[in-house]
Amino acid sequence: MHYRAFYIFCWLSVTNIALGQKADLKIAPSVILKLISDLQSNNDTAFPNGGFVTFRKSNWSSQFKIDQNSFYTALILFNLNQYEAKMSKEDQYLLYQINQKAIPYFINFKNKNKPSYNFWPKYPPVIFPNGGWLNHFNASGALPDDIDDGSIIQLALKNNDNDSFAIALKHEFTLFVNTTTKTTKGFYSKYKNQKVYGTWLGNKMPVDIDMSVLCNTLLLSEIYQLPLNQIDSNTYNLLIQLVKDAKHLKDPSYVSPHYEKSAIILYHLSRLYKYSHYSLYKNIKNQIVQDAQMALSIAHFPLEKLLLQNTLLNLGEKGAYLLADNPFLLQQNNYSLFVANLATLLPNPFKRWVTKTKFFRYSYYCYPYNLSVWLENYYLNQP
């Protein structure tokens, strides 16, 4: 960890009277952005330059391992870049520096022959970095590129490229739609024949459908203002029906196996709502609001509360949704945004069985990402 970031950690700690209690001191957004900047890897031997360190933990171990992936660094850039116009000139310049350091980081995740990206490094391929015996399978077990990483990375890089890259990427997505070459065997039978986007961009993988991933994929089209095709409409309509059926509340780990939690699904739904131009999707706003308010009333973890507050703010619900707690609380690794889950590769009924046992499941944590969500909350509260 960089010494400057360590000093800020200490300062944030002493301002908090007791862990979990509200701090009287109001934290300026520039302090948080500076902390994020200081947590960005800078010629660190343990992590490539420009990225943000992420940790993973298996369900059967208490050990946290550094995981080099594209996803969290892209999420941080996307979260911050959305609110550049609301930042001070000094913070805008700092954000520019963060972006410039991060852009080269994505090169080793980019497919050299296609417009898509991978979760882990591709050249050479790596799975579960620092994974011990798992790394004997780096080549044979390498994952294909996927629509989730592709969408978020492309959104993170929006200010640094032109729309042609997004157009090419979306075309690549259409080649791996459910029922095109394969039909999903790990989703509700009621919807298994829906022509919607599959997570994996590879013919050797089973078709995986994830509610949150679908939100991110549609978000790419909405922010880049790409014309919606029939697959987009099908995907929107599936999301609408799943919300009406309350699958995100009753069955979150099945309907969104890469994210698993109701609060996180609601956050994805609300972020898509903020940018969406699909009129039928706008009609489910009230249900998402009610669901988020209910979830917030019973939320326990700081990041969980923050995501739900941001969900309501994305939906235009103004209120006391600013997390005034010390951001140091977000350093706790007690609520993961994303999981790597063997169950996503399995057909029914094995998918449900493995999901319940949490066998071969890894939770991912990234403190700089949590801080970017805190900043998102701050700026969503600004006029």
Regions found by a protein language model. Give the residues of each.
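Bacterial Sec-dependent N-terminal signal peptides
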Residues: M1-A23
